[in-house]
Amino acid sequence: MGKLVVQGGTVLEGEVEISGSKNAALPIMAAAILCDEEIILKNVPRLQDVFVMIDILRSIGFRVEFDENELKIKRENDISQEVPYELVRKMRASFNVLGPIAVRTGRAKVALPGGCSIGVRPVDFHLEGLKKMGFSIKVEHGFVEATFERRTDQVTITLPFPSVGATEHLMTTAALLEGTRVVIENAAMEPEIVDLQNFINRMGGRIEGAGTSRIVIEGVEKMQGVEYSIIPDRIEAGTYLVAIAASRGKGLVKNVNPDHLTNFFEKLEETGVKLKVFGNEVEIEMRERPEAVDVTTNPYPGFPTDLQPQMMAYLSIASGVSVITENVFKTRFLHVDELKRMGADIEVSGNVAIVKGVEKLSGAPVEGTDLRATAALLIAGIIADGVTEISNVEHIFRGYEDVIDKFSKLGAKIEYVEKEN
């Protein structure tokens, strides 16, 4: 495990190209289990989590080739019903292969998921939904076993919370339940779910309603091979936009879908940022100290929780007091203590953080606690006086393709240093 050494005080300027969305690619890769024919996915980011999912697909009988950003997936052997624990523990999205394997083979056994440690992520929503679709569920010794027992004509699943993972998992599983109509109420509405629907429908699925709170899936008998391009990563785009604004710079962010970031753009503009949108490119300029704004995270189309830590780093140097309310992951404030080490003035009470803007942050040794928190610390390091050393930095490589290279091309002074044994 290495660390990032960041020389602060740089102004970011230039162009940056946004990669394909990890959060769209992973569920689409899981959905490829539904098909025997070759799937070709384009615009796939080369990230640690993607490589874990590749290993999972290979372990259950699929041939996978990954060349640059193109992924080819085809079933080669009988689908294995069990996924090795050492793969599942690395990433929570791997749990979403449970339903697809079970619907293909009648049974699946998958370890309870790992991944980001930002509070409890119950898989109960997934399991209750699978039960309603006719699967029996057994949980013991850290594993979940799903066995298909009965087919039902009509199923309605109302999610207690619009969980992205549960929505994707249940959609994908239901797509191959021939003769069953599944309705998911209070579904998550994220763009990545629309992307998953579009992919499954291209394979021959019959899903409608993604992007709204009600998704209807008519199960089909089989899927066919397709070629499909993954949407751009809205969180990566937002991260670079915040970083450029925080450094009081100017840049062009390319390969963005602006419709996916409307709420975020509004908040940036409230701080004084100038934004211009040209098709799938966004020009940003910020030369002043930002104005404080209040931010409340909510499920899409609200302000994304995955951009809250980066926004907090930015608002830590704003003029005035910002109130940040976290409504999605209640414990998503692990970055606060690290930002305070750099001189930020932040107080947390429950799911609310009060951020009193300071003139400057100071470089300090800090520790990454999860993917987005580490991105926030990187932004803080870029705008701070002096040198910031971020340890436990491997998180960032799970969600940002070529992150050091992209930031360096914008003018950031960042070096990855291997930890000495």
Curated annotation (Swiss-Prot):
The active site is at C116 (proton donor). Phosphoenolpyruvate binds at K22, N23. This is UDP-N-acetylglucosamine 1-carboxyvinyltransferase. It comes from Thermotoga petrophila (strain ATCC BAA-488 / DSM 13995 / JCM 10881 / RKU-1). Keywords: Cell cycle, Cell division, Cell shape, Cell wall biogenesis/degradation, Cytoplasm, Peptidoglycan synthesis, Pyruvate, Transferase. Cell wall formation. Adds enolpyruvyl to UDP-N-acetylglucosamine. It is an enzyme of class 2 (transferase). The modification 2-(S-cysteinyl)pyruvic acid O-phosphothioketal is found at C116. The keyword Transferase applies. It catalyses: phosphoenolpyruvate + UDP-N-acetyl-alpha-D-glucosamine = UDP-N-acetyl-3-O-(1-carboxyvinyl)-alpha-D-glucosamine + phosphate. Its main location: cytoplasm. It is found in: Cytoplasm. InterPro entries: Enolpyruvate_Tfrase_dom (IPR001986), Enolpyruvate_Tfrase_sf (IPR036968), MurA_subfamily (IPR050068), RNA3'P_cycl/enolpyr_Trfase_a/b (IPR013792), UDP_GlcNAc_COvinyl_MurA (IPR005750).
